[in-house]
Curated annotation (Swiss-Prot):
Changing residue 45 to A: Complete loss of inhibition of Gabija host defense. This is Gabija anti-defense 2. Counteracts the host Gabija antiviral defense system. Probable nucleotidyltransferase. Transmembrane segments: none annotated.
């Protein structure tokens, strides 16, 4: 079945902007939101899974630029508010498809997903039956069985039932866990799905771990249930900190005029607020020697001139130098270019009398870069790029 009605309802709930971002990053929504959708219940929050750390970070960057409010950030998940929606990015692991996500889930009633790569639902064979019967069937391969044990009460409050054999299966699966440190115990006690009992041991260190002592510590604690509604958050100050925690791949970095920059997940050069956990340091001179930048200019009577200032000329084989002194209130003292993958974003892209020029920039002339746009005080004009060639650039960029 196509479940077109449920798909339309999901898209309407998420909104066009978010749907397009989820498509671009080939995300998968799975779990409670899909269960609520098929049970005709109100959706409380949306758990979003990704195929790679690159896709997860790309999605977060897109959302960050549209004014989201991050409410919690743990090693396993990041929860943020986008307009009225509560979105939880799951990043303790990355998944190739819905079935691999289901392998980590605890109950079949959660095993529903919508894949934005295929724009189709994937449902476990017992998903609809067990939801209609309101019964819990446990998956012993779940990633966090202690959390599953805690979640039983949540489902019984929603009038689901669990048989004694199924409950025993959860307990026995918990017994099979290998836990040798407080950190491993905390990892099994929460940090996602609204279960945050890892906070029971947030002040404990890894040395001298003893499970029986840990059990006794719980008995001695007097804590209100509301205490466990908020997760143990990782500290972060900006987007880079969040990306550093989610990204498992090395980040290419370089220092330009004493400022730290990185090659972002979108491939563009941008200033780096904090150092990534793992990095590949690029040689700055080598980077500028091998990198070309681009700009659309007016071609008239054989001359290449600026669209912004018709008297400013770019001559192939010569240096072009910005006029005036740099200030923060105007374009004075700066020339503006695009990285190769961002030429379509150029202010003058599509102008009838426009042509694309290729330039080199030296480190000493570099001013700033962000989202594919580059500022410099001067450049060396290399050549005029043919229309067929730059259209191939755009075609290649759009196919990525």
């Amino acid at each position: 079945m196509s479940y077109q009605f449920e798909k339309n309802k999901l898209y309407a709930y998420l909104g066009e902007e978010l749907v397009e971002a989820l498509k671009r990053n080939e995300a998968i929504i799975a779990g409670g939101a899909i269960t609520s959708l098929f049970n005709n219940k109100e959706i409380n929050d949306v758990d979003i899974y990704f195929r790679s750390d690159k896709k997860a970070c790309s999605f977060l960057e897109e959302c960050w630029n549209s004014n989201v409010y991050v409410t919690s950030h743990t090693k396993k998940a990041t929860l943020f508010i986008k307009k009225r929606l509560k979105l939880q990015m799951i990043h303790f692991k990355f998944f190739s498809d819905a079935e691999s996500i289901f392998n980590t889930f605890d109950f079949t009633v959660c095993m529903g997903a919508f894949d934005f790569k295929t724009e189709a639902f994937t449902l476990h064979e017992d998903f609809l039956k067990h939801n209609s019967q309101r019964i819990l069937k446990f998956n012993s391969q779940t990633a966090f069985p202690i959390v599953s044990l805690l979640r039983v009460q949540k489902y019984t409050d929603k009038e689901y039932t669990i048989s004694k054999p199924e409950f025993i299966r959860i307990v026995l699966t918990c017994m099979d866990l290998t836990i040798n440190t407080y950190e491993e115990l905390k990892d099994q006690m929460g940090g996602m799905y609204g279960i945050n009992y890892d906070k029971l041991f947030e002040d404990e260190k890894d040395e001298d771990f003893n499970l029986r002592e840990a059990v006794d510590k719980i008995a001695d604690m007097v804590l209100d249930e509301d205490y466990f509604k908020e997760p143990v958050n990782l500290e972060f100050n900006d987007l880079d900190d969040l990306l550093n925690d989610i990204n498992k791949s090395p980040v290419m970095t370089l220092k330009i005029n004493d400022d730290q920059y990185r090659i972002g997940l979108d491939g563009f050069l941008k200033e780096s607020v904090s150092a990534p956990c793992t990095e590949i340091k690029l040689d700055t001179k080598d980077f500028f020697d091998k990198t070309n930048f681009y700009k659309f200019v007016r071609k008239q009577n054989g001359k290449l001139t600026s669209f912004y200032d018709k008297n400013f000329e770019y001559v192939i084989g010569e240096e072009a130098k910005a006029e005036g002194v740099i200030d923060s209130w105007s374009n004075s003292g700066k020339l503006f270019f695009n990285e190769k993958a961002a030429i379509e974003q150029s202010t003058y892209y599509g102008k009838e009398d426009g042509v694309l020029i290729e330039v080199k920039i030296k480190e000493k002339d570099f001013v700033d870069a962000d989202n594919g746009k580059v500022e410099a005080t001067a450049c060396q004009v290399i050549r005029e790029v043919s229309k067929d060639e730059w259209k191939e650039y755009i075609s290649a960029n759009n196919s990525k």
